[in-house]
Swiss-Prot record:
Pfam family, one: DUF1967
GO molecular function: GTP binding; GTPase activity; magnesium ion binding
UniProt entry keywords in alphabetical sequence: Cytoplasm, GTP-binding, Hydrolase, Magnesium, Metal-binding, Nucleotide-binding
HAMAP family: GTPase_Obg
Description of how the protein assembles with itself and partners: Monomer.
Annotated residues for binding of GTP: 165-172, 190-194, 212-215, 282-285, 310-312
Cofactor(s) needed: Mg(2+)
Protein's name according to its UniProt entry: GTPase Obg
GO CC entries: cytoplasm
One example of a Gene Ontology biological process annotation: ribosome biogenesis
EC number from the UniProt entry: 3.6.5.-
Chain residues that bind Mg(2+): S172, T192
Amino acid sequence: MFVDQVKIYVKGGDGGNGMVAYRREKYVPKGGPAGGDGGKGADVVFIVEEGLRTLMDFRYQRHFKADRGQHGMSKGQHGRKSEDLLVKVPPGTVVKDEKTGQILADLVTHGQTAVIAKGGRGGRGNSRFATATNPAPEIAENGEPGQERDVILELKVLADVGLVGFPSVGKSTLLSVVSSARPKIAEYHFTTIVPNLGVVETGDNRSFVMADLPGLIEGAHAGVGLGHQFLRHIERTRVIVHVIDMSGLEGRDPYEDYVTINNELKEYNLRLTERPQVVVANKMDMPDAEENLQAFKEKVGDEVKIFPISAVTKQGVRDLLFEVANLIETTPEFPIHEVIDESDTSVMYKFETEGVKFDITRESDGTFVISGYDIEKTFKMTDFSRDESVRRFARQMRGMGIDEALRARGAKDGDIVKILEYEFEFID
């Protein structure tokens, strides 16, 4: 098992803008305001897809931006809410906020969903602001900005394919050739003492996880050598790739190796022999390999399909990967015969705005900079092209206590105040 990790950017859709409009119909004097509200922006929703096994797809698309809501219209018509953006993830994906490290979701079962970036609400149209003293307001809100964040996806990956075979037959070399994994490679027994895993992608954009498992020797089912550790990992795989050294340089007979490994898999008695097995004749670039392969074929018979390859020269590797990918698609998952802790450790996470309404700092040129979730959200939802909206924004700032706080920090008439990229003069 290893942890695959990728960083992506998600943004919920902005809400649609409210509209300033008036009812203008014949025989209807003083029709009044008729601007509709904007629609809600779409959420970015992660959903578990049981057919996915890796995070490979996120290597190519790392930005996910949901659609904004439709703007409000005249005649009191509200904008349409946008459809949520569904992002498929494999089972076992943990989503963390990159900035805070907070776990946003732990996605386990097929169809499970989690809202990772909420869409903004639609801005209100001018019909919402009508009062007895202002029956025809020329004011409307912009849509609320959608939530945006960088998130880290982590996936504890189990291997789809297990490489088995005696030590030093070339399993680590094969894994390094077909994936980005970089296992230790050396010509001595038990080079691999813990499983190395790599994500393999075929030429037709299919992907799977391949494990170079610890070398297996006779007696592994009884715990000899690294036996139990090896067999626990292979128990989780769906396809077994049996790598055999056809060069004979180690002084072993390829057929005897083949029989010994299969006997060990059978003795472990966890349906390992029911898994499809691909026999790989490796090191075919060596001098005596072809002769040894012919002798091996005579002993195993025609019913065993053999893929001659050279992991070093990559000869035959492409056809091997296509065969393995086809077998994975047609082979069901096998049950795991071990105790699994099923205690309920689920946690509900709730999106909350920041507790502090605003913060005031002063730059070297004397400019007062106001920041904070509430004031920045209010600023973005204000339509500054309309005088009435600007006056409303000034009232909202006073209501938040910003004017009073600026005076306490020494602000005087004519001083520059900045919110985001917008600058204005302070008037006492």
